[in-house]
């Protein structure tokens, strides 16, 4: 009986961890959707007048986030079924193209920062689950919106090194203390205890789990300017239609 109870406890723990991972992915699209609704509300009330083209673009972007939420709810329902695991669909993905798309989606949250995107040349094609990569990068950008100094630049760039794709994200702040570089990826650890900053402390833990499941990695390292940066690595895709990923 004790052995059976241990098995049940392990299953319950695994299920709780899985649901924590997949439900966390709802937070970023909800935050982006809220930002677009705020922009539309400010325009409608005259607080911040906007051009008709901008209003149309914001409405379209908000509806895209609603679509993402619907897809992610389906993912959660799938993950909640008995015997299920974290759904992953690795496919060849243009790293620069998808990163640029996520940056554009997150723009309302980062409107108080100057964003520098060093798009790679030539193209970098990686093997990854696009939805999960979007989740990881979206969370990192949401973190920058919360913690990066207002008005200061947030920089993103990527390259190929040692046969793998690398993407970095940094700002001009003081960075994360070196002694916290590993602890911050543990579940329920937050970067700040400020009451005004919301968060569950599961985001970076989920990001590391997702990157690992895709054969990648996420870590923190010095940025060369006295601060720190997040570094993501992913495997390069094999040749696609005769074109090498490198």
Predicted regions span which residues?
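Conserved catalytic submotifs in the C-terminal HATPase_c
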Residues: 91-92, 116-124
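Short alpha-helical segment of the dimerization/phosphotransfer core of two-component systems
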Residues: 61-69
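Short conserved segment of the HATPase_c
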Residues: 176-188
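Short helix-loop "hinge" at the ATP-lid/N-box region of the Bergerat-fold HATPase_c
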Residues: 144-145
């Amino acid at each position: 009986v004790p052995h059976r109870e241990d098995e049940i406890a392990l299953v319950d723990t695994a299920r709780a961890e899985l649901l924590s991972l997949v439900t966390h992915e709802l937070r970023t699209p909800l935050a982006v959707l809220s930002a677009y609704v705020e922009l539309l509300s400010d325009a409608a009330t005259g607080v911040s007048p906007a051009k008709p083209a901008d209003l149309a673009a914001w409405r379209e972007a908000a509806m895209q986030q609603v679509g993402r939420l619907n897809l992610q709810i389906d993912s959660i329902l799938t993950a909640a079924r008995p015997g299920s695991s974290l759904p992953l669909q690795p496919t060849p993905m243009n790293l620069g193209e998808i990163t640029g798309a996520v940056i554009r989606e997150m723009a309302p949250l980062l409107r108080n920062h100057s964003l520098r995107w060093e798009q790679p040349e030539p193209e970098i094609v990686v093997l990854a689950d696009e939805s999960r990569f979007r989740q990881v990068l979206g969370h990192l950008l949401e973190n920058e919106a919360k913690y990066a100094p207002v008005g200061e630049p947030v920089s993103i760039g990527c390259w190929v090194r040692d046969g793998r794709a690398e993407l970095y994200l940094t700002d001009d702040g003081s960075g994360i203390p070196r002694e916290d570089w590993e602890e911050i990826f543990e579940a329920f650890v937050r970067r700040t205890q400020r009451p005004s900053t919301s968060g569950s402390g599961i985001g970076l833990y989920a990001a590391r789990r997702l990157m690992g499941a895709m054969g990648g990695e996420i870590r923190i390292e010095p940025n060369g300017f006295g601060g720190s940066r997040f570094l993501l690595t992913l495997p390069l895709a094999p040749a696609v239609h005769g074109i090498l990923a490198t």
